[in-house]
């Protein structure tokens, strides 16, 4: 079973995905985690990702789509994926549809996590203390939230 969790940054997609991974024995596909991994590698792509994320922008779809393609082509993960924050754009949705068709898969359920801006800010402030994520400063989060809502 393949699932999609969508919602603004800080809505709890990652938290819910982790719970579902344990319950369903699926694999979490977290674009945020994948992008942070690329940043850690300090590659040219990682530097571009860091620049975009630091400025509250979403990372270019071509970069994200390639990372997703690598996961969907893994036969061990077929029909066992929980997408956390992907797709975020029409381009990403079209890419996902194409890749699902190519790999003979489908999305079984889509969940939208609807959370207020105030709640998101509170959660991010807590997450910043606990997880110490580089993309969790208040100004960046507000920019990402506003970009998401456009």
Q: What are these model-predicted stretches?
A:
Residues 1-150:
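Glycine-rich phosphate-binding loop of ATP-dependent small-molecule kinases
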């Amino acid at each position: 079973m393949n699932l999609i969790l969508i919602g603004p940054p800080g809505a709890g997609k990652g938290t819910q995905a982790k719970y579902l991974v344990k319950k369903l024995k699926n694999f979490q596909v977290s674009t945020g985690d994948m992008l942070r991994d690329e940043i850690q590698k300090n590659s040219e792509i990682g530097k571009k990702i860091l620049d975009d994320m630091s400025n509250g922008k979403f990372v270019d779809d071509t970069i994200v789509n390639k990372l997703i393609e690598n996961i969907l082509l893994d036969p061990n993960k077929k029909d066992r994926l929980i997408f956390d924050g992907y797709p975020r754009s029409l381009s990403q949705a079209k890419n996902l549809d194409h890749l699902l068709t190519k790999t003979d898969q489908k999305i079984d359920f889509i969940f939208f996590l609807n959370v207020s801006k105030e709640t998101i800010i509170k959660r991010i402030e807590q997450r910043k203390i606990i997880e110490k994520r580089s993309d969790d400063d208040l100004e960046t989060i507000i920019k990402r939230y506003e970009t998401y809502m456009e």
